[in-house]
């Protein structure tokens, strides 16, 4: 590193006000020249100390001001402070210049070939439940159904009463349903979407209603208080159980492939007759769907002539279909966000 010229002041050099002013002027000129010629941050730091430090030239002048008269001290003090502020500004500007010069040199030395392919960010993938639900929707859309949705916070009327679920039905029990107040609740199925749709759209109707539903189930390997459901509704003239059976079998064969399927008689308040659908899984029968012919009372409450129009409804849980498809034995794995599990799909 090159030597930096210095300008020092001693007490013996001070004889009069004019001498001090001359020394300050010379100091300012010499310091400016040294700052402009400083080529490194280290040189700048040494200049800062020699000029503005406790033992620097300006500090020496300020210390000997006591030897001057009361009238002279303000003159010297004002000039010294002006020079101090000016030198601080020069030092900071030169520091910024050195930083910019270093950055320019770095940019010149570190050229980037923009034609080189980047490493890229690993792409994400759909959650297995989303993929399963999308596949279910695609199958029914291929059968001529359209997708409808509705609110997750429902009224007692749409969730229960309009679906022929009586006041004393166990599903209305607070142990099974999340009530927000006396008349509002978190929907326990997506069937209310069907009612809302039929209120505004006369038959014929072919819709599916996917979405989240809520039930007060204890969390275990096969139950969750929040899960995904897809409801199916078909209303048309001369619809009978064979249409229901054919639709369900077509859907299950398309989704699972050649797998044993059976229908069992069951009961649901909003369908009559009703059935549950089982498939073979790990050597046992596993329920995967509930279905049935729409109860005429449900249609009549909506002002639909049940003598002219008939239909069927079916419902399924997306989680269960995904578990059967991928041989997953615990529903909780879907909600832990464990990448070791999710990256398998």
From Swiss-Prot:
Disulfide cross-links: none
GO BP, sorted A to Z: phenylalanyl-tRNA aminoacylation
Chief location bin: cytoplasm
GO cellular component assignments: cytoplasm
Pfam families in the cross-refs: Phe_tRNA-synt_N (PF02912), tRNA-synt_2d (PF01409)
Catalytically driven reaction(s): tRNA(Phe) + L-phenylalanine + ATP = L-phenylalanyl-tRNA(Phe) + AMP + diphosphate + H(+)
EC number(s) per entry: 6.1.1.20
Residues the entry annotates as binding Mg(2+): 272
Location(s), subcellular: Cytoplasm
Note accompanying the cofactor annotation: Binds 2 magnesium ions per tetramer.
GO MF term (any one): ATP binding
Obligatory cofactor(s): Mg(2+)
Record's keyword terms, sorted: Aminoacyl-tRNA synthetase, ATP-binding, Cytoplasm, Ligase, Magnesium, Metal-binding, Nucleotide-binding, Protein biosynthesis
HAMAP family, A to Z: Phe_tRNA_synth_alpha1 (MF_00281)
Subunit and partners: Tetramer of two alpha and two beta subunits.
Assigned protein family: Belongs to the class-II aminoacyl-tRNA synthetase family. Phe-tRNA synthetase alpha subunit type 1 subfamily.
NCBIfam families in the record: pheS
Protein name from the UniProt record: Phenylalanine--tRNA ligase alpha subunit
Lineage: Bacteria, Bacillati, Cyanobacteriota, Cyanophyceae, Synechococcales
The gene coding this protein: pheS
